[in-house]
Swiss-Prot record:
GO molecular function: ATP binding; cysteine-tRNA ligase activity; zinc ion binding
Superkingdom of the organism of origin: Bacteria
Cofactor: Zn(2+)
Binding site for Zn(2+): C44, C235, H260, E264
Protein name from the UniProt record: Cysteine--tRNA ligase
Binding, ATP: K294
Location(s), subcellular: Cytoplasm
Species lineage: Bacteria, Thermotogati, Deinococcota, Deinococci, Deinococcales
Subunit structure, interactors included: Monomer.
GO BP term (any one): cysteinyl-tRNA aminoacylation
GO cellular component: cytoplasm; cytosol
Amino acid sequence: MTQPTITQDTARQPNPNITLYDTMQRQKVPFVPGTPGYVGMYLCGPTVYSDAHLGHAKKEVAFDVIRRALTHFGYQVRYVSNITDVGHLLNDADEGEDKLQARARLEQLEPMEVADKYFWSFFRDMDALNVLRPSINPRATGHIQEQIKLIEELIEKGHAYESAGSVYFDVRSWPEYGKLSGRKLDDQEEGTREAVRDEKRDPRDFALWKKAEPEHLMRWDSPWSVGFPGWHIECSAMSLKYLGEGFDIHGGGLDLQFPHHEAEIAQAEAAGHHFARYWMHNNMLTIGGEKMSKSKGNFTTIQDILKKYDPMVVRFLLVSSHYRSVTEMNEEAFASAANGYRRLSETLHEIERRLKDAPAGSDTALDSKIAARVTEFEDAMRDDFNTPKAVASLFGLTGELNTALNAGPVGRDTLERARDAYRSLGGDVLGLFAETGSAASVAQDDASVIDALMDLVLKARQNYRLQKQYAEADELRETLGKAGITVEDTKDGARWKR
């Protein structure tokens, strides 16, 4: 398997001096792609058997920002994220019912109907959160032959064995098993609570292929039995197919570090393939200090949270926390995020409003402040994608711009630089200002309509004042106040905010 070809037109050699935290090395290290100008990223995607929850949102937004930042710094990024639609069993191990099949029985649907239903549900949620679509979105069921081929390679090299129609990875044959998580093989043996199945040589061996029971609906022919692939093999096979040997970044949630990512490495490397060069993991969400999980019943779906909060407020809350930090989700955190996002978006709207009739020229002092904040933002993103510091830079810029805007007219050139900085850093990198036409831009499209309507309302109020119809002008102001809109009279005319 080879690295995808880069054309001469798109190949670049940026050198932004990025450092990232590599889980394998357990420290921050310089990021040097295997191919200059190109980054291959693989993210473990969802198992599509139910609606996505906020834990999925944390992971997807975190790696979306990393992808956006790499693009901002000049890299061509191929971003692959899989869809698990077979092989993920209820206990995340080798026994139990397939999660999709269990849901299919509950909803009285075919497993593939369940997969399609929640596949599209997942992407509606991601679109709302302004998460860019992956370059490639491979589904496990569409890559059965690639998985079988990798299993055959492992058997041939003596790292896997067939037993009663199933195939297992022989962990004792691969001494490096456990190097990502730091778990020693002997410690794993002492700590295991799984009884050794007759068909397993060792309780720590994991399934590469499972023989299907008669009631199992999802099944394919293989050299060993009619069955289905194990959960771990799909990611090894598909990442190598679409990103090639030694691709750059493999990402996922911290909960996947063991056993899933550990198994991926063992499968790929034992078969003779050079696997991922950097490993990145996002941390978890907590609610009331407890880890959010379905087993605890304290999880919230993305759809439910979007009924209460603007999608960009949810995204703002997520990027305000470092991807390697725990993010606490509560009403206070959402209220703070709503205020913070409102401050940024209102400043951008005010800049765009002022541009309509801004005087020519620029403000050298303010231009210097804008440039300094851009540098500050980019330095934060170079340092292991430190989004909290990057957001703080945007707030610093916001304060400086509002001070200048309140002091009087600002030159067009400077306003354009400020607008471009907001759109580039807050929009293109952090994804907080959605592109026109995307699902996430709907609320912002609505905001544009509100801006236009408010211009008309303020002009009507000004006409009342000019005609000395002060009662009518005050009534308009009071009505707006009841709707949560504050009108401020300044020397440059009336301004409004929510």
